[in-house]
A protein has these predicted regions:
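Conserved NTP phosphate-binding and transfer environment spanning the P-loop NTPase/kinase superfamily
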Residues: 130, 134-186
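Domain-scale detector for complete catalytic domains at protein termini or as standalone homologs
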Residues: 31, 43, 59, 181-182, ...
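Conserved nucleotide-sensing/catalytic segment adjacent to the nucleotide-binding pocket
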Residues: 82-138
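Glycine-rich phosphate-binding P-loop
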Residues: 53-81
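Short acidic-glycine loop/turn motifs at beta-strand connectors
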Residues: 52, 90-93, 140, 161
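Feature captures the catalytic cores and cofactor-binding loops of soluble hydro-lyases/lyases
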Residues: 1-36
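P-loop NTPase nucleotide-binding/switch module
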Residues: 33-53
Length: 186
């Protein structure tokens, strides 16, 4: 850059970005990056898995089986985005992106086993750094006193940062194959 331009930028503490890319391509890349980094963000408890290209956020009370369901999905060839805590960012009016805090990226915690490094155990193709939130599956203990939609006629939604995401409540009973249920829902 011009030496005077550089001097004034330093003098006024203005960041100066340089790249060998064409200015239009570089500007577009910076705008995309800023759009994600400055987007409204919340933390959500659950597991985010990419199932057949759809971002499935599995939620429910602690100990209900979210991580176990995710592990079975990974074993079936799907991809882990994040376990336990998701950082959800609203990057556009209709798009939510989920990612893991750096400290938990690519790890799953299994009660009684400990922490598993999914990337090391299953390979690089078993993980993703970010993923869209397309569907929420809420796991809950089955209750004989509650009526459950057996035909899928009732539409449920969950609201995150003003975005309505399709949702399914799945009652948990011994012997249910949660991975298969998640695949079917996706």
């Amino acid at each position: 850059p011009d030496p005077l331009f550089l001097k004034k930028a330093v003098e006024h503490k203005i960041p100066l970005l340089m790249s060998k890319k064409a200015s239009s391509a570089f500007t577009a890349e910076v705008i995309r990056w800023l759009n994600v980094k400055l987007a409204p963000c919340i933390s959500v408890h659950g597991v985010l898995v990419d199932v057949y290209g759809e971002g499935v956020l599995i939620t429910g009370e602690s100990g209900i089986g979210k991580s176990e369901a995710a592990l079975e999905l990974i074993k079936r060839g799907h991809r882990l985005v994040t376990d336990d805590v998701e950082e959800l960012r609203k990057v556009s009016d209709d798009t939510l992106i989920g990612s893991a805090p750096d400290i938990t990226k690519h790890f799953i915690e299994l009660r009684g086993i400990g922490i598993i490094d999914v990337k090391t155990l299953f390979g690089v193709s078993s993980v993703k750094d970010t993923g869209n939130i397309d569907l929420v599956i809420r796991l809950e203990d089955w209750s004989k006193d509650k009526e459950y939609d057996r035909l899928g006629l009732e539409e449920e939604y969950v609201d995150y940062l003003g975005n309505k995401i399709a949702s399914h409540t799945i009652p948990i009973r011994p012997g249910r194959n949660l991975a298969l249920i998640c695949e079917s829902a996706a």
